[in-house]
């Protein structure tokens, strides 16, 4: 019988504990962790993500700001806004919601964020810390998945872990975090040959490609742990993952659902890293 990895329940537990830590920080040091989310344009999915982040931040006792900009905003204006928040001592975390309009260079925007406030973990300084085995700010989705492994007692050392998708947001940082735990990692992508055969060797299979129900039972060995990062809409508008949940559940020992799996943990780690940034500010 497959065990469902309930990311929603774990996120609720962690956010409740975080709210208590925030309350203590405010009482003892007079500091409230501050998070600003900058949204450019009117991408419907991004709007949903931003609302969820704002709601969770306020519920945990954070100072939360959301800046909504027209998709016609120029890159220089956006960088100027980021610089203002870099200098704002009441803001400990800055997140620019991706994707950005085509006329704005993502890399330039990420570089503009103070690495100490880069709670998405995308700044080259933070990726350098991650790849040198000294993680500081870590991309939130991989960080959330690692918390799931810990909470559910999933052993990583010596296990074969296969990641489908090599993005800077999930695939690459996920690979490094697993290597740090002594897993044997294979990072696959759209040019990988015999993908199904490689996936069938996985004790732990992590999928982040943005293609609904791409991973079927033909990709999964019996007893594997399957982590589905995908968020897609089917023809009826229903939210589905990259993994064909029903058929893969027949083989997997543990699996994350969509929705209610990885997504809530991503937001939780965003808040946790903002809190940690506020703590570091106190100790300076």
Swiss-Prot record:
SUPFAM superfamilies (alphabetical): Aminoacid dehydrogenase-like, N-terminal domain, NAD(P)-binding Rossmann-fold domains
EC annotation from Swiss-Prot or TrEMBL: 1.5.1.5, 3.5.4.9
InterPro entries, alphabetized: Aminoacid_DH-like_N_sf, NAD(P)-bd_dom_sf, THF_DH/CycHdrlase, THF_DH/CycHdrlase_cat_dom, THF_DH/CycHdrlase_CS, THF_DH/CycHdrlase_NAD-bd_dom
Keyword Oxidoreductase: yes
GO biological process, one term: purine nucleotide biosynthetic process
One Pfam family linked to the record: THF_DHG_CYH_C
Keywords: Amino-acid biosynthesis, Histidine biosynthesis, Hydrolase, Methionine biosynthesis, Multifunctional enzyme, NADP, One-carbon metabolism, Oxidoreductase, Purine biosynthesis
GO cellular component, one term: cytosol
Catalysed transformations (reactions): (6R)-5,10-methylene-5,6,7,8-tetrahydrofolate + NADP(+) = (6R)-5,10-methenyltetrahydrofolate + NADPH; (6R)-5,10-methenyltetrahydrofolate + H2O = (6R)-10-formyltetrahydrofolate + H(+)
Binding, NADP(+): 165-167, 190
Domain of life according to the entry: Bacteria
Pathway(s) it belongs to: One-carbon metabolism; tetrahydrofolate interconversion
GO molecular function, one term: methylenetetrahydrofolate dehydrogenase (NADP+) activity
Annotated family: Belongs to the tetrahydrofolate dehydrogenase/cyclohydrolase family.
Function comment: Catalyzes the oxidation of 5,10-methylenetetrahydrofolate to 5,10-methenyltetrahydrofolate and then the hydrolysis of 5,10-methenyltetrahydrofolate to 10-formyltetrahydrofolate.
Name this protein carries in UniProt: Bifunctional protein FolD
Biological source species: Streptococcus equi subsp. zooepidemicus (strain H70)
Name of the coding gene: folD
């Amino acid at each position: 019988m497959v065990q469902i990895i309930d990311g929603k329940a774990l996120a609720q537990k962690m956010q409740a504990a975080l709210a208590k830590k925030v309350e203590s920080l405010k009482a003892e040091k007079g500091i409230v962790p501050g998070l600003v989310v900058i949204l450019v344009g009117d991408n419907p999915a991004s709007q949903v993500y931003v609302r969820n982040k704002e709601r969770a931040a306020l519920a945990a006792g954070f100072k939360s700001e959301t800046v909504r900009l027209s998709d016609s905003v120029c890159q220089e204006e956006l960088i100027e806004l980021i610089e203002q928040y870099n200098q704002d001592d009441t803001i400990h975390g800055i997140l620019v919601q991706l994707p950005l309009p085509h006329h704005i260079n993502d890399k330039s925007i990420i570089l503009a964020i103070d690495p100490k406030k880069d709670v998405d973990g995308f700044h080259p300084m933070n990726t350098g810390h991650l790849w040198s085995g000294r993680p500081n700010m870590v991309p939130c989705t991989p960080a959330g998945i690692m918390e799931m492994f810990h909470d559910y007692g999933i052993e990583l050392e010596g296990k074969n872990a296969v990641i489908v998708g090599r993005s800077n947001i999930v695939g690459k940082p996920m690979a490094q975090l697993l290597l740090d735990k002594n897993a044997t990692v294979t990072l696959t992508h759209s040019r990988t040959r015999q993908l199904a055969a490689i996936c069938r060797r996985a004790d732990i299979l992590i999928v982040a490609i943005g293609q609904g129900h791409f991973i079927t039972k033909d990709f999964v060995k019996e007893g594997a742990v399957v982590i589905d990062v995908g968020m897609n809409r089917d023809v009826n508008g229903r939210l589905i993952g990259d993994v064909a949940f029903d058929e893969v559940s027949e083989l997997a020992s543990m699996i994350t659902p969509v929705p209610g799996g990885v997504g809530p943990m991503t937001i939780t780690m965003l808040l946790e890293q903002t809190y940690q940034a506020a703590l570091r500010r106190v100790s300076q």
